[in-house]
Amino acid sequence: MALNPSKEAILKRIRQGLTRRNPLPPEPNFSTDIYSRSEESDLSIVFASQFIHHKGEFYFVENKKELEIQLAQLAKNRNFQHIYVWEKSLIDLFSNSDISFETSEKDFSLAGVGITTCEALIARTGSALISSATLSGRRLAIYPHIHVVIAKTSQIVYDIKDGLELIRQKYGNALPSMICLETGPSRTADIEKTLVLGAHGPKELIVFLIDDSI
């Protein structure tokens, strides 16, 4: 029985469609940045603007002595309690300052402020790249309500991939068990879309950036 001409035309188009191969989509270029680069050439300015945008507290200091003075003044003005410092370089730095801090794990459950270094600062996102490889470990950057990061201008890189490359070069195949980005205070809006700071980590993130370009 002959098919209806209109049905025959439809079936013919279907058969042609099944035999016709569509061209493959172009290969994506994963090496190309998907974000436009900032026109600002000074990475410290790029970082600071993004960091402040994400509710971080930023201080620029010219040297370690100014860092001691500024941090001691901040601790006094804000009445910082139970400050913990575990990294030897920071313990040595603040040993003669007016900052009172604990260098052991004694009463760590009371920790209010943790002072650590970082692996790098990411300018594009305004983030601190933290790892568990330092003596601060995992807890000191996460548990206290206030996290203070001490960094140098030479540690600023533009993007996340640049920071991860620094870690790869530094540690090789023995990568730290924890590598994370801190972008402003910890936050969540899971419940009724209400923003809550300090949900899964520090309620305040403070960065002191030391100019070591000279």
Where do the PLM segments sit?
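The feature marks the mature, well-folded catalytic cores of soluble enzymes
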Residues: 1-214
